[in-house]
């Protein structure tokens, strides 16, 4: 939004030309989102407390979690507001990739908001019925997948690139829509499953989102992409602003979500952030690298799948409790230890993922 104003004012004051630079707008984006999160956080938490929008805790979960009952939830609305506001302020709103990511963020955020509202306000323990939750997620996922497919301007936009190997790629054709759907819906639910401990989901989200911002900047630059021998996707660099806003909003939220949490993000935050990461990974054509960097989200999801499959087939559980973070809690690990160790794992995976950009 301010980019348009700066372009107009540039003809009178040349200093406004600096606003055109992606790095400058990314810095302003992270500062704007971080500032909004920190400033509005106390007000949001107080408002949620007054409205008695508190988290209910499962009776069959770890006993240490019972003290969390009543902690304000739906704090993801703060994250999404900060991200969307900063993105609208500092990004190029004519860029179709920015619009696609904003659509995914808001649509999945709405699904999560309805689910949270039914649980904590209407006191419906099941929230939004699973079939309807997946229906609306699928509708949004297929919509953005189809939209990106039919508006693709170059073959690189719908090609799957394999890391580590130079020139190894698969033209997906219509299967691009299917891949995009699973990336968006799958990681939306993966982040939601991970969001079970204080700060456990938001910090890996910030780290992976920041790494995707770096990748977006590189693939959106013809010189850098040619040097690194990675796909060049014109316009993808504009997502740096969104990723910066995500990092800022996430860090601001972590200020209040760190152990012991003053607020939880709820489904409104987790579903939206996971879906946003998934669609950005697709746009920048680094799906496999993204899956590597998101190893924590993948492990949490796989642990649930294995647990359910094992119990249905054999009547036995593989883990003491799923998702995986609860397994370690029941083994006696204090919650902060589980959280920080999962963060450390994410740091290593993100660094490895970024290193693959040079490994060919």
UniProtKB/Swiss-Prot annotation:
Q: What is its main location?
A: membrane
Pfam families reported in the protein's UniProt record:
Glycos_transf_4, MraY_sig1
Query: Membrane-crossing residues?
Result: 26-46, 70-90, 97-117, 134-154, 167-187, 199-219, 236-256, 263-283, 288-308, 338-358
Classify the source by domain of life.
Answer: Bacteria
- EC code(s) of this entry: 2.7.8.13
**The protein's annotated pathway:** Cell wall biogenesis; peptidoglycan biosynthesis
Query: Which GO molecular function terms does the record list?
Result: metal ion binding; phospho-N-acetylmuramoyl-pentapeptide-transferase activity; UDP-N-acetylmuramoyl-L-alanyl-D-glutamyl-meso-2,6-diaminopimelyl-D-alanyl-D-alanine:undecaprenyl-phosphate transferase activity
GO cellular component terms, A-Z:
plasma membrane
What this protein needs as a cofactor is: Mg(2+)
Q: What class of enzyme is it?
A: transferase
- Which InterPro entries does the record match to this protein? Glycosyl_transferase_4, PNAcMuramoyl-5peptid_Trfase, PNAcMuramoyl-5peptid_Trfase_CS
The record's Gene Ontology biological-process terms are: cell division; cell wall organization; peptidoglycan biosynthetic process; regulation of cell shape
Family the entry assigns: Belongs to the glycosyltransferase 4 family. MraY subfamily.
Query: Which NCBIfam families does the entry mention?
Result: mraY (TIGR00445)
Name this protein carries in UniProt = Phospho-N-acetylmuramoyl-pentapeptide-transferase
Q: What is the source species?
A: Saccharophagus degradans (strain 2-40 / ATCC 43961 / DSM 17024)
What would be the name of the gene that encodes this protein? mraY
């Amino acid at each position: 939004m301010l980019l348009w104003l700066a372009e107009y004012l540039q003809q009178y004051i040349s200093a406004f030309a600096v606003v055109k630079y992606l790095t400058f707008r990314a810095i302003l984006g992270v500062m704007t989102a971080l500032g909004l999160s920190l400033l509005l956080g106390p007000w949001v938490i107080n408002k949620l407390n007054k409205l008695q929008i508190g988290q209910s805790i499962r009776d069959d979960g770890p006993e240490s979690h019972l003290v969390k009952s009543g902690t304000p939830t739906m704090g993801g609305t703060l994250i999404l507001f900060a991200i969307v506001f900063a993105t609208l302020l500092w990004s190029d709103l004519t860029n179709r990739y920015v619009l696609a990511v904003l659509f995914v963020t808001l649509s999945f955020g709405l699904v999560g908001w309805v689910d949270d509202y039914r649980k904590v306000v209407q006191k419906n323990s099941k929230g939004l019925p699973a079939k309807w939750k997946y229906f609306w997620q699928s509708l949004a996922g297929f919509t953005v997948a189809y939209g990106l497919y039919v508006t693709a301007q170059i073959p690189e936009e719908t090609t799957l690139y394999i890391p580590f190997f130079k020139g190894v790629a698969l033209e997906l054709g219509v299967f691009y829509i299917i891949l995009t759907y699973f990336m968006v819906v799958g990681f939306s639910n993966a982040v939601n499953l991970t969001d079970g401990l204080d700060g456990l989901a938001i910090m890996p989200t910030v780290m992976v989102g920041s790494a995707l911002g770096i990748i977006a900047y590189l693939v959106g630059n013809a010189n850098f992409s040619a040097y690194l021998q990675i796909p060049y996707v014109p316009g993808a660099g504009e997502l740096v602003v969104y990723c910066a806003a995500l990092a800022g909003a996430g860090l601001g939220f972590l200020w209040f979500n760190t152990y012991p949490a003053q607020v939880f993000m709820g489904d409104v935050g987790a579903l939206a952030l996971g879906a946003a990461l998934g669609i950005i990974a697709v746009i920048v054509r680094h799906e496999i690298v993204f899956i590597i960097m998101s190893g924590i989200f993948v492990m949490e999801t796989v642990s649930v799948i294995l647990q359910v499959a094992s119990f249905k087939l054999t009547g036995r559980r593989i883990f003491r409790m799923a998702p995986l973070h609860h397994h370690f809690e029941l083994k006696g690990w204090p919650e902060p230890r589980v959280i920080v160790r999962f963060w450390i794992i994410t740091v290593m995976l993100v660094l490895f993922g970024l290193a693959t950009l040079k490994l060919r």
